[in-house]
Swiss-Prot record:
UniProt-recorded name of the protein: D-aminoacyl-tRNA deacylase
A GO term, aspect molecular function: Ser(Gly)-tRNA(Ala) hydrolase activity
Primary localization class, coarse: cytoplasm
Catalytic activity: glycyl-tRNA(Ala) + H2O = tRNA(Ala) + glycine + H(+); a D-aminoacyl-tRNA + H2O = a tRNA + a D-alpha-amino acid + H(+)
GO cellular component, one term: cytoplasm
This protein's record includes keyword Cytoplasm: yes
Domain note: A Gly-cisPro motif from one monomer fits into the active site of the other monomer to allow specific chiral rejection of L-amino acids.
Length: 149
């Protein structure tokens, strides 16, 4: 499982020019599900994302987590995080999990985050989306549940 986490002041996602999800202070998270991902990958990523200490404390030190600041999550499915561009000029997406299976795991990840008491909004799985992000920092992190980077 791969995610790109962006600390935001606000973020929203539109499908067919309609806002389908929006948050205030928190994380905009692009979520890619790989062929080898399991529930254990989802649990690892949920714990990692919700507990990343990248919000400033009273001394302006990155010391607080999303949970600490009562932040919100906008989760957006993005299979292109598994794009392999090492050969040629067109990305190869062979390591991304296919549609129905990926949707099940994405939905499970959303549920797991909501169970933690976090406000969670989402895009629409498989849809063409327009994402509006007001970055804070900017702070952007790339995480991989297999710890490849």
């Amino acid at each position: 499982m791969r995610v790109v986490v962006q600390r935001v002041n606000k973020s929203s996602v539109k499908v067919d020019n309609e806002i389908v999800g929006s948050i205030n202070k928190g994380f905009n998270v692009l979520v890619g599900i790989g062929k080898e991902d399991t529930i254990e990958d989802l649990k690892y990523m949920k714990d990692k994302v919700l507990n990343l200490r990248v919000f400033e404390d009273e001394e302006d030190k990155m010391n607080l987590s999303l949970k600490d600041v009562c932040g919100e999550l906008l989760l957006i499915s993005q299979f292109t995080l598994y794009g392999d561009c090492r050969k040629g000029r067109r990305p190869n997406f062979m390591n991304a999990l296919g549609g129905d299976e990926a949707k099940k795991l994405f939905d499970e990840f959303v549920s797991m985050c909501r169970e933690e008491g976090i406000k969670v909004e989402t895009g629409v799985f498989g849809a063409h989306m327009v994402v509006d992000i007001e970055n804070d920092g900017p702070v952007t992190l790339i995480l991989d549940s297999k710890k490849n980077f």
